[in-house]
Amino acid sequence: PYLNAVIEGYDVDLVPCYHVSSTAEMKCAVDRTPFHTRYLIDKIAPLREDVLLLKQFCKGGGVYGSDHMTGGFSGYLCELLILHYGGFTQFMEAASKFRYGEVIDIEGYYPDRKSVRALFTEPLIVIDPTDKSRNVAAALTPTRFSEFIELARDYCEKPGSCYFIPDA
C-alpha cells in the first residue's frame, strides 16, 4: 500500500497513513510507519552501513521481502536486528546460531522468552518496539528462516562478496 517514485534522482517510497497519536488508535497496518521511523531515526544513524549490508545480504540470498510470495526479511526487521546486535558482523555471528523460536525483545516488554513463545509461534520472534503485541518477523517463513541461518553460517565460515549478489 505505498507509492514508489523517483524524485530528483532519489528512489522514494511514499506510505499513506492516518495520523494517530498511538498504535492503539491505528486504522490500518501502515499507520505504524511513523512510529517505526521515530523509534529508529536517531538510534540507527551510526549503523546505517551495517543495515545496508544486511539488506543487500538478504537480497543476495533471496530472503529479502516480507511479501507473501517471498516470506523473508522486511527492511524494518533488518534495521531492528542490526540495532539489537550492534552491527552486521555481530548479527551474522548470532544468526548463525539461531534456533526455531528465537526471541528478540529490544525494549524488554516481556519478563522471559517463555512468555513470548506462548504468544507467538513463528520461527523468529522480534517484538516491535512500538507495539508489544506485534512480531515484526511474522511474515518470515520457516523455509526462509532456515535458508538465512545456513547463509549466515556459510558467510561466517568464509566471508565473500558472492553473498551480496542475487542469482541472475
Regions found by a protein language model. Give the residues of each.
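Conserved nucleotidyltransferase catalytic core and NTase-mimicking acidic/glycine-rich helix/loop elements
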Residues: P46-A168
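Conserved catalytic core of two-metal-ion nucleotidyltransferases
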Residues: P1-E25
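Generic structural signal for short, solvent-exposed loop/turn connectors between secondary structure elements
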Residues: G9, K27, K43-E49
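General "foldedness" signal
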Residues: H19, M26-C28, H68, S96
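Histidine (H) residue identity feature
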Residues: H19, H36-Y39, H68, H84
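Intrinsically disordered, low-complexity terminal tails enriched in acidic/polar residues
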Residues: C28-D42
